């Protein structure tokens, strides 16, 4: 199922490359111009920042409490196209219930000898002197085929997959560069269309999968606003902003309420003030991306955790901490 879903994810990823609209052009011709502009790019470098400002408001009927949650992070991303590889290095600061945590991260994804994808990720928290590595290899992924597929998608393909774009009537200026401003929205309806298209191509109803159905339920109401700024002269996307600030949090709030079901008369509401990502990108030669020897040694020695297990534990920990935080607020 993972391999089949990759097709849909590739479509969503390719959406970030559909740029450079001009009123005298069609979407297809502009998309081709973008492909021509990026075809010779041997690599790309991105500087990215993210911000989360949220709160959980809790009430037991007589007392109201608010639990602030904040997160900020900066990341530097490098990518090469042949072979396909990425390097992500950055850090995050998290704060909740008056407690702060600083985390340093780095991740390396490289094309394996069999064409699959190998990912090595390192995390070090402020309470951890050494940090630890996690590893995953997926041989079901053919990175070369995925790259070829993303380059072959057209604007018409995007529409078929539920992705539509809006071009601002006026040019925007980004770091002194005149740019086209192109925006799109990815929501549960978009994801549902992608899932149905993947099901058609796979000859299998993926919506019947329990894990997929549960994920779609969690995503219901969430909305991702994306704006791309495209160099008007080169048709290269040089900046991007994303936010989820227009999301309907009804479903997430119902999950929080379920976690507090044991607390009679208690209600809780998640308030999202800002959840955004900003990135700027440059194109050109990027130094070869290599996995650090310490990461390879950790895997060989069996000291690296599974990335799948790490992800599952993070989700479980987040759910537990949210419930405990809300319960503690009520107790106060």
State the predicted function of each range.
Residues 1-2, 122:
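Generic N-terminal leader/processing signal
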Residues 2-22:
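Sec-dependent N-terminal signal peptides of Gram-positive bacterial secreted proteins and lipoproteins
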Residues 21-332:
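Subset-of-secretome marker
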């Amino acid at each position: 199922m993972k391999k089949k879903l990759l097709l849909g994810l590739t479509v969503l990823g390719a959406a970030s490359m559909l740029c450079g609209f001009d009123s005298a052009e069609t979407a297809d011709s502009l998309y081709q111009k973008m492909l021509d502009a990026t075809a010779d790019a041997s690599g790309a470098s991105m500087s990215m920042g993210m911000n989360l400002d949220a709160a959980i408001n809790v009430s037991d009927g007589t007392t109201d409490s608010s639990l602030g949650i904040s997160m900020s992070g900066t990341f530097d991303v490098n990518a090469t196209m042949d072979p396909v590889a990425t390097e992500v290095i950055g850090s995050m600061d998290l704060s909740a219930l008056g407690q702060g945590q600083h985390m340093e991260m780095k991740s390396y994804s490289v094309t394996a000898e069999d064409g699959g994808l190998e990912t090595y990720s390192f995390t070090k928290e402020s309470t951890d002197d050494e940090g630890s590595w996690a590893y995953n290899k997926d041989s079901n992924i053919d990175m070369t085929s995925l790259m070829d597929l993303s380059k072959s998608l057209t604007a018409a393909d995007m529409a078929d997959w539920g992705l539509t774009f809006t071009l601002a009537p006026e040019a925007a200026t980004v770091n002194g560069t005149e740019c086209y401003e192109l925006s799109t929205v990815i929501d549960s309806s978009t994801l549902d269309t992608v899932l149905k298209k993947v099901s058609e191509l796979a000859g299998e109803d993926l919506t019947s999968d329990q894990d997929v159905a549960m994920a779609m339920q969690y995503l219901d109401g969430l909305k991702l606003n994306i704006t791309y700024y495209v160099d008007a002269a080169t048709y290269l996307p040089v900046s991007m902003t994303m936010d989820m600030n227009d999301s309907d949090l009804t479903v997430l709030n119902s999950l929080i309420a379920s976690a507090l079901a044991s607390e009679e008369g208690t209600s809780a509401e998640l308030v999202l003030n800002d959840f955004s990502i900003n990135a700027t990108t440059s194109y050109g030669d990027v130094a070869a991306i290599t996995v650090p020897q310490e990461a390879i040694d950790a895997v060989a020695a069996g000291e690296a955790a599974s990335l799948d297990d790490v992800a599952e534990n993070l989700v479980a920990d987040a759910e537990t901490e949210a419930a405990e935080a809300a319960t503690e607020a009520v107790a106060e």
